[in-house]
């Protein structure tokens, strides 16, 4: 085996990525704080929308508030999720704009034309928004109504009265909604990582089982802590990962 064989995980690019994240830390923290600032005032309207949404509250379920701080904590949670969303959007935009130049400063061929960068950024933005909308539709029409209806019927089947705490219910719903929007960004994130050389296609294909497990684990982290939610969030991530690999193969 010769020494020029490319590493499955390019360590030089990975180290440069870590350096890039450190340099962007101030910007990312700023975007998170901006998300908190924007998210908290509008979180009241978001809560009202969820309360009125079809299928989010089964007919035989009663909502209660146990502690006076529940609404404030809910608004902070929603604002935090918006802040995290802005941080991820910033990373995607920066990575798509700078490309390999961001990761490998020795690359001289990534300067490109300004118009090319604009086109690439526009494509990434439209793709990200489109994937987010698809994720939101999946959560709104399939994931949330199906799960809540299942949980309500399961409790009724054993003779229990469905009385849900506002914070627990809405935290569950917003967690699923946020997880769906983020998880549907998987194809875009994988393609950006492949095209910038941070990871190689060999790494993804050779470690497919581990990545599938990681996707399900990430689904458990992003979604409420129950097995059904984990598979309903992590499952689409696995499918979207395979779609992104197919797109990468076709577009090369």
What residues fall within each predicted segment?
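Membrane topogenic/interface segments and analogous intrinsically disordered interaction regions
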Residues: 1-252
């Amino acid at each position: 085996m010769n020494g020029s064989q490319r590493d499955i995980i390019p360590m030089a690019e990975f180290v440069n990525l870590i350096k890039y994240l450190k340099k962007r830390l101030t910007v990312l923290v700023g975007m998170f704080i901006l998300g908190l600032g924007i998210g908290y005032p509008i979180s009241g309207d978001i809560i009202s929308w969820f309360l009125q949404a079809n299928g989010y509250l089964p007919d035989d379920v009663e909502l209660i508030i146990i502690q006076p701080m529940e609404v404030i904590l809910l608004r902070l949670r929603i604002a935090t999720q918006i802040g995290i969303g802005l941080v991820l959007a910033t990373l995607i935009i920066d990575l798509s704009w700078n490309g390999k130049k961001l990761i490998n400063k020795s690359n001289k061929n990534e300067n490109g034309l300004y118009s090319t960068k604009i086109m690439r950024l526009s494509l990434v933005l439209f793709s990200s928004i489109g994937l987010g909308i698809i994720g939101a539709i999946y959560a709104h029409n399939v994931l949330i109504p199906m799960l809540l209806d299942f949980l309500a019927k399961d409790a009724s089947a054993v003779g229990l009265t469905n009385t849900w705490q506002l914070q627990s219910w809405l935290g569950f719903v917003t967690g699923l909604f946020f997880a769906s929007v983020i998880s549907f960004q998987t194809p875009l994130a994988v393609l950006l990582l492949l095209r910038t050389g941070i990871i190689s296609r060999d790494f993804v294909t050779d470690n497919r089982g581990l990545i599938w497990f990681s996707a399900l684990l990430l689904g458990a982290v992003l979604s409420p802590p129950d097995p059904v939610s984990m598979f309903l969030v992590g499952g689409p991530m696995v499918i979207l990962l395979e779609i992104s690999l197919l797109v990468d193969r076709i577009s090369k």
